């Protein structure tokens, strides 16, 4: 049984722009998809319309399992954000956004799951620092 976390950008692209239609069903057949508390929070934060809010609420409601970062994940995320952010010369805003990606990656790693994402750049940087499986979707 292969496990996966879909990154926020996959849901947004699929719901708002009908992206990834050809791969959506195949991904669900290939993986048991688990929800990340971080992804659900990002989706809820960005849901501006009633329809979008309902989609996010439905996703949370039907999720049999929601994976959350542990205190150790938060601790390691701080180190990763500092190290990668310093190397890349990022400002505070970019570092804050990247922290969520680090938390998603660390949660996936702990469960042996693949992160499915359109954010090839940030998860590529993370995969150089920690052992995670990333499936890029374009």
Residue map of PLM features:
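Short, well-structured N-terminal submotif of metal-dependent ribonuclease cores
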Residues: 1-35, 44-60
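Alpha-helix capping/helix-boundary segments
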Residues: 10-11, 39, 73, 103-104, ...
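Phosphate- and divalent-cation-binding pockets in alpha/beta enzyme and binding domains
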Residues: 42, 76, 125-126
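Structured helix-beta-strand junction loops
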Residues: 29-31, 61-62, 111, 129
